[in-house]
Design a protein with these regions (language model features):
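Terminal amphipathic alpha-helical/low-complexity segments used for targeting or macromolecular assembly
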Residues: 1-57, 61, 135, 153, ...
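Short alpha-helical DNA-recognition segment
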Residues: 63-66
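Beta-rich strand-turn-strand
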Residues: 140-164
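Flexible, glycine/small-residue-enriched loop-and-beta-strand segment within the central core
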Residues: 39-49, 68-80, 84-149, 175-176, ...
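Short-chain dehydrogenase/reductase
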Residues: 84, 137, 155, 161, ...
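Short conserved AdoMet
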Residues: 60, 149, 167
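Glycine-centered loop/turn positions within well-structured domains
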Residues: 97, 160, 168-170, 178
Length: 190
């Protein structure tokens, strides 16, 4: 059999992306969330905030964290005050996630903070921070990809995919997300 692989060098696709220590930390977190939070009634937001803080999350006041959301690494999550992480939201945040005040992640939204370089023979793992400024709304089932910066007041419509930065006080929709229209900046007119 003829092969182009270097037998002495193990296949890059089979190498782990994370250390055993990291995997054990995330396993501990997942089990604790399952036992302490996943089953809790929706109104117990403060309890879930407390548990997240015990695992290193930096959270502002009056956050609404729903029990069936999935946060990959709470120690890489930072929020300001009055942030909503809704039902079914998934934060895959190996590069970190920052959520500005009054930002909302609606049901089943997905923030994906990592990918792989598919052009590399090493299939290199790439992680990027996702940032949402204040008053950003990520609508139901929308996806935000690695490294995307959502500027103040931007909206990503339902089931849309943001692969590029979102401009301030603008509405985006589609896959890939495209600018639709301006959002009324209620901060200037209140």
């Amino acid at each position: 059999m003829i092969t182009t692989h270097d037998i002495k060098n193990p296949d890059a696709y089979l190498r782990p992306s994370f250390s055993i220590k990291d995997k054990l930390r995330r396993l501990t977190w997942s089990v604790c969330w399952l036992i302490l939070c996943r089953w809790t009634p929706n109104p117990l937001h403060r309890w879930r905030v407390f548990v997240l803080k015990c695992f290193g999350a930096k959270l502002g006041q009056n956050n609404l964290i729903y029990p069936n959301c999935k946060i990959w690494a709470p120690w890489l999550l930072e929020t300001e005050e009055v942030v909503t992480i809704g039902p079914g939201v998934e934060l895959y945040n190996p590069g970190g996630v920052y959520l500005g005040h009054h930002s909302i992640l609606s049901q089943d939204a997905y923030l994906c903070g990592a990918t792989h370089d598919f052009n590399s023979s090493e299939f290199t793992y790439i992680k990027r921070k996702i940032t949402l400024e204040p008053y950003v709304w990520i609508c139901a089932k929308a996806v935000v990809l690695p490294g995307v910066f959502c500027a103040e007041g931007s909206v990503l419509g339902a089931s849309s995919v943001a692969s590029r930065d979102l401009s301030p006080w603008s509405v985006y929709a589609g896959n890939p997300a495209k600018y639709i229209k301006e959002r009324h900046n209620f901060l200037l007119h209140s």
